Every structure is written in C-alpha cells, then in structure tokens.
UniProtKB/Swiss-Prot annotation:
Main subcellular location: membrane
Subcellular location field: Membrane
GO CC terms of this entry: membrane
Chain segments annotated as transmembrane: 337-357
Bilayer topology: Single-pass membrane protein
Organism, scientific name: Rickettsia prowazekii (strain Madrid E)
Protein name (record): Uncharacterized protein RP855
Keywords, in A-Z order: Membrane, Transmembrane, Transmembrane helix
Length: 520
C-alpha cells in the first residue's frame, strides 16, 4: 500500500510540474514583441503587462543580417509577435467603392482587393466615410505592401522558432488614425474632432513624421530624415517650416473647414520649449508629453517615441493585415491554440483523476485508522470487563455464554420509585441539591448474593428565627420520622455542622443522606 501511495504521489507531482511548465509557456500574460519596420531601420521592443522589458534598433543595411534579430528573439522565446509596417514600400490608395446591396452578396471591399491587388501583397483597409446619397459609397483607405525582405526574412525567423507565435501584421498609418483619434477625444471633450489635424512626432525608424488627417481620413503622411548632426533648434526649424508648407498646400481644404486647424506636437521637453515660441498663424497648438500620451504612465521619456508608439499600438490595434500566406499562418496558429487547449484540458482531467484517486486513498487510510482505533478500544474494553468480571474471563463453553446472555438480559433496577417515596416524606424545609445512585454487586447477579441500590442525597435544611440547637433538634426529629416510615430501608445521614449558614436569622443546614435498598 505504501509503494502504491508513493507511486501515485510521483505521478501527481510529475503531472503538476509538467502542467505548470506548459501553463507558464502558454500563459495569457505572455510577453509581446512588436517589430516596427521603417525607412531608417527596424525597432524591436518587448512588453509584459504594458511595461517595456527590452528594445533594440537595427539600422537599415544593404544586405540584411538576421543575427541581431535572432539574438533578440532568443531572449524571449515564449512570446507573441506583432509586425508594424511603416516603410516607403507601404502604399496608400484611396477608393470610392459603390455598394450594391441587392446584387453583391460577398464583401465588396474584399472583392475589390482581389481584383486590383497581388494576392501575395499584405493588405489592410479602413472605411473612413460612408455616404448614402445618391447611392451608397464607401470611402476606403487601402494600405498595401509587398511580401519581401526584410519582412519575409524576419517572419521566417519567427516561424523557425516554434515557441514564438505570429499574432498579426498591421500598418502604422491605419493604427495612427486610432491613436490620434484617442488623443483628440481626450482634449477638451473632443473639441477638435472636426478640425484639420496636423500631428508631429520623432522616431528612429521614420525620422520626423507628419500625419495630416481630418476626422477618420488620413490625408497624407510625410517622413523627413532626422538631422542627428544638427542642433535641436534646427529640428525645431524643420518642424515649423514643414507645418507652414502644409498650410499652403491644403489652403483650400482648410478654408472649407472655416480655418479650423489643430496642431498636435508629441515632443520632449526641449523641443517643446522651442516650439512654444513658434508662431503657427495663431492655430490651436496642443503639446503632448512623450511619456504621458493618453495618460499612460508607463511610457518612456525619450525624444524618439518608437517604444511608446509600439506600446500604444498593442492596446489600440484595430486593422489587421492579411495575404494568402498570413491566412495559412493564422490557421496554423489557430490549430496550435486549439491543440494546446485540448492538451491542457486532458492534463487537467488527468490531474483531477489523480487527485480523486489520491483523495480516495487518503479516505481509505482514514477509515482503516478509524477501524483500528475502534478495534483497539474494543480490546481495551474487553480486557476491562474480563478484569472486572473474572468468571467470564475464559468464555469458551455454552454455559459461559448462557451466563453472559442472562447477565445482559437481567433488568437493572432504577431509583425513581424510591426517590419519589423519599421526596414525599421530606419536609418542605428541605431543599434537594444533588442526587447520586449506584447498583452494587452486579457481578454476582446470578449468584445468591444480594444487590444493593444506594442513593446519595445532598440536602439543605432551612429554618427561620430559630437557634442552631433548636434547628438541629427539629432536623433530627424529622429524619428519625422518615427512618421510621421507611423502616425497610437503611437510611443514614450526616449533618455538616461546620458549614451551617446563619443569614439574618435564617439558618441553612447542609446534610448528606445515604439510602440503601437491598434487592434480591
């Protein structure tokens, strides 16, 4: 039994260890890696619970070297990986797609994409406006990117590492629309939602980025090289000049909006101090601290906000991209997730079975111990009976069994009738405090010897306005009267004179009475 128990314990411990290991690997709080691809390089960042764990910027080279990517990914082998595309290979296309609800049964945008784009291209879209008159038109922004190096090479590295999960590819342009909308909503109760919006920030992957939008429509995006060899004043001049150029370029557009313009500058403190003195034609200028975008307290306080953009993307990602290869990978990831869930379920069931077996085993041991304790108590009681009643010590014959049977069948006399007679004859001055009774000589029940029923009473005798001597005499007289009335009983009594209480003329005399009734 001990070997079986140890064997079951080893199985249980092994399953628990394996299950916890797998649970740690596939935990819902897995690390998340964002691969941000821009014109100037690739920025990799890893997050856990919205906190930045590590980051790496790899500048663009003529021929891609996968070693730094592999080294970075190897530090977080059990992670979910997201790609965020922002390079010059990402193309924007605006289309007005008519919707014929009565004729078209499939997704009209998907049908449009299949007709105008390469199946291998990575594509995502956003419907930013829907008009219904004179007919229903979907104004759509479609982002596309060829599936080529360095994206294809990095994805190959991820697929080779089976512990990494490719969760999706997104275009930064579409995700910035969501992030900027969130920023605008947080400013004076969405006051600038209908304004012409110019958003500026600085990143390592794209340099100085300018996003021009109105409502949900990304009008244009422009990236300028960041002048690392120049002063911050030079950077301030670039931003100021470029914004003025946008005002000239979109003069008619701005006029149609009644000159309502909002400039959102996501910059560090140094750039902010310089840009605050800049005259943007009295336009509304909103400065957003780089480390407090959307009131997120876990952001990095750096001029280049690649890590912060990646962090915000993880929270607000909305437009996944796809192509044929990605659909296949998605299916494989789904199958992997389902397989893990099935595997986890089987592990849980097996663990429950082992726990139930272990619980039942413990219960069996508990029941066995209880039976052993009862058996031991019975043996002790049997030994006590043999010691108290020596004539049944060796009960081996029918005669001995007959004696035991008769002993058990013999009725035990009760003291209630005798007590009733005693109490009736007691004077009301007596107060009953305690009663004890016992039956003696029961071991000789089947022999000639007599049994004795002994009753022990503790009484208190109360008198008023009498001396102690007078009270004792009355007590003796009353007890003698009881003995005369119950002459067939042996009645003895003892008065505790040293415990007599005298309370303002009221005497309380304690006494004990022994009554013996002989039973044949």
């Amino acid at each position: 039994m001990i070997k079986i128990n140890l064997f079951m314990k080893n199985i249980s411990d092994s399953i628990k260890l394996h299950f916890l290991t797998k649970l740690k690997i596939f935990s819902f709080k897995r690390e998340k890696i964002v691969v941000l691809l821009g014109n100037k390089g690739v920025f990799l960042s890893t997050f856990l619970n919205n906190k930045l764990l590590d980051q790496l910027f790899i500048p663009t080279q003529g021929q891609i070297d996968l070693t730094p990517y592999k080294n970075f990914l190897s530090k977080f082998p059990k992670s979910d990986v997201y790609f965020l595309l922002d390079g010059s290979e990402c193309k924007m296309r605006y289309d007005q797609i008519p919707i014929l609800q009565s004729i078209v049964k499939i997704d009209p945008i998907e049908q449009f994409i299949e007709g105008y784009f390469n199946k291998e291209d990575i594509i995502a879209h956003c419907v930013y406006e829907i008009t219904t008159k004179p007919s229903e038109i979907w104004s759509t922004l479609i982002m596309s990117c060829p599936f080529e190096t360095p994206l294809s090479d990095i994805i190959s590295c991820i697929i080779d590492k089976r512990s990494l999960d490719l969760k999706g590819i997104h275009f930064l342009t579409l995700e910035l629309k969501v992030i900027i909308n969130k920023i605008v909503q947080n400013i004076q109760n969405d006051k600038y939602n209908d304004y012409f919006q110019v958003c500026v920030y600085v990143s390592q992957t794209s340099g100085i980025k300018f996003i021009i939008k109105h409502k949900n429509n990304i009008i244009t995006i422009r990236n300028l090289d960041y002048p690392f060899d120049k002063t911050t004043n030079y950077v301030q001049g670039i931003i100021e000049q470029e914004i003025h150029d946008f005002f000239i370029l979109f003069k008619n557009y701005i006029s149609n909006l009644d000159q309502r313009v909002c400039i959102i500058l996501i910059v560090d403190d140094e750039l902010k101090s310089l840009l605050e003195s800049t005259n943007f034609e009295d336009r509304n200028v909103i400065f957003i601290p780089v480390d407090n975008i959307l009131n997120k307290q876990t952001l990095e306080k750096e001029r280049f906000i690649d890590a912060n953009i990646s962090r915000l993307f993880l929270e607000y990602k909305s437009f996944p991209a796809y192509n044929n290869n990605l659909k296949s990978i998605k299916k494989l990831v789904t199958i992997k997730d389902l397989t893990f869930k099935l595997y986890t379920t089987l592990l849980i069931v097996l663990l429950l079975i082992v726990c139930i077996i272990k619980y039942n085993t413990k219960q069996n041991y508990k029941d066995i111990n209880s039976i052993n304790e009862k058996y031991y108590a019975t043996n002790q009681e049997y030994d006590s009976i043999k010691y108290k009643y020596p004539y049944i010590k060796n009960t081996t014959s029918l005669a001995d069994l007959y004696v035991i049977e008769k002993l058990l069948e013999t009725p035990v006399p009760l003291p209630f009738d005798l007590l009733e007679r005693l109490i009736i004859n007691l004077n009301p001055a007596f107060k009953l405090e305690e009663i004890k009774w016992e039956l003696t000589n029961i071991d000789n029940i089947l022999l000639i010897s007599k049994r004795q029923l002994i009753i022990k009473l503790i009484l208190k005798y109360h008198t008023n306005n009498l001396s102690i001597d007078e009270s004792l005499k009355l007590l003796d007289d009353h007890m003698q009267n009881i003995k005369n009335k119950l002459s067939h009983l042996q009645i003895d009594y003892v008065i505790y004179k040293d415990k007599i209480l005298d309370i303002f003329g009221k005497l309380v005399i304690p006494l004990s009475v022994n009554v013996v009734d002989y039973k044949t």
